[in-house]
């Protein structure tokens, strides 16, 4: 099958198509992970994006449902240097997602690094793609909106409340689902924390009706500035009970506290991002997937930076300055402590979430 990748600057990249025979538009990004293509493709945070893998070989260890981070592929398309085996091809076909192989992913990555993320179109076809078609495809890319103009969270958030009960419940969390990864839920449940997953646009009254001991605002796709409704809910919850966040959730908490976010040139996507804990000086290697960040020049009043990225000095964690009152506790991280895929250096943060919930539960009982 023929494959073609068309960039907004008119660049045409031809290769071998695999997966579904179709055409998609999206923001072209790169991921530096050496493994974990199943987790990456099924991560809801990739909604609206075509993912390029910098590691050259993909598909060599198959596909298993136990690795899924959601109910299916959420990325729009997949770009690899070499694709091996039939499982990855079948996987993309099952979810009607196109892929392209046999292309210079190093060239694509360097282009994104230099120019920034790029609007693009990926087309696969059993018929050769002509020069006349190329002109039409370029026009489609140029007319495609920037990802900041697309409201992506409603496409990946749960439509109804889902409860995950821990066998020996120690505490309960309401998770505001902006496109949560399954491994985040798993990390909480296995620590004795029952999780009530609610839609992104749930109001504080509904959230509090589940009697949570803390709230976690999840990861997800797109620009946090588009999510005024969720920000308002988070703002109303702060001071009522402990509030934590991961990735997009971190950005929403930043805005709720009075801070600002901005779009990164090419984002952080991969399992090898070094993060420094400002208090302890410890460095963690973390898994990340985000294209927006907290503006360190506008730290919300009453808050402080908690973690920083050692590659580019961007903000990786923020917290409300500690109070003796647990209900005022607020902290969030930009990276993914659950990994999925990636290192487990920061999974202790789930222990801290659960411990926070247990303490607040006891405080409520007194």
Swiss-Prot record:
Residues 1-168 are annotated as: CPSase. The keyword Glycoprotein does not apply. Pathway: Amino-acid biosynthesis; L-arginine biosynthesis; carbamoyl phosphate from bicarbonate: step 1/1; Pyrimidine metabolism; UMP biosynthesis via de novo pathway; (S)-dihydroorotate from bicarbonate: step 1/3. InterPro entries: Anth_synth/Amidotransfase (IPR050472), CarbamoylP_synth_ssu (IPR006274), CarbamoylP_synth_ssu_N (IPR002474), CarbP_synth_ssu_N_sf (IPR036480), Class_I_gatase-like (IPR029062), CPSase_GATase1 (IPR035686), GATASE (IPR017926). Keywords: Amino-acid biosynthesis, Arginine biosynthesis, ATP-binding, Glutamine amidotransferase, Ligase, Nucleotide-binding, Pyrimidine biosynthesis. Residues 172-363 form the Glutamine amidotransferase type-1 domain. L-glutamine binds at residues 45, 220, 222, 248, 251, 289, 291-292. The keyword Protein biosynthesis does not apply. It comes from the Archaea. It is an enzyme of class 6 (ligase). One of its GO terms (biological process) is 'de novo' pyrimidine nucleobase biosynthetic process. The active site is at 247 (nucleophile), 336, 338. It catalyses: hydrogencarbonate + L-glutamine + 2 ATP + H2O = carbamoyl phosphate + L-glutamate + 2 ADP + phosphate + 2 H(+). Its EC number is 6.3.5.5. GO terms for molecular function: ATP binding; carbamoyl-phosphate synthase (glutamine-hydrolyzing) activity; glutaminase activity. Composed of two chains; the small (or glutamine) chain promotes the hydrolysis of glutamine to ammonia, which is used by the large (or ammonia) chain to synthesize carbamoyl phosphate. Tetramer of heterodimers (alpha,beta)4. Small subunit of the glutamine-dependent carbamoyl phosphate synthetase (CPSase). CPSase catalyzes the formation of carbamoyl phosphate from the ammonia moiety of glutamine, carbonate, and phosphate donated by ATP, constituting the first step of 2 biosynthetic pathways, one leading to arginine and/or urea and the other to pyrimidine nucleotides. The small subunit (glutamine amidotransferase) binds and cleaves glutamine to supply the large subunit with the substrate ammonia. Belongs to the CarA family. This is Carbamoyl phosphate synthase small chain. It comes from Methanococcus maripaludis (strain C5 / ATCC BAA-1333). The lineage of its organism: Archaea, Methanobacteriati, Methanobacteriota, Methanomada group, Methanococci. The gene is carA.
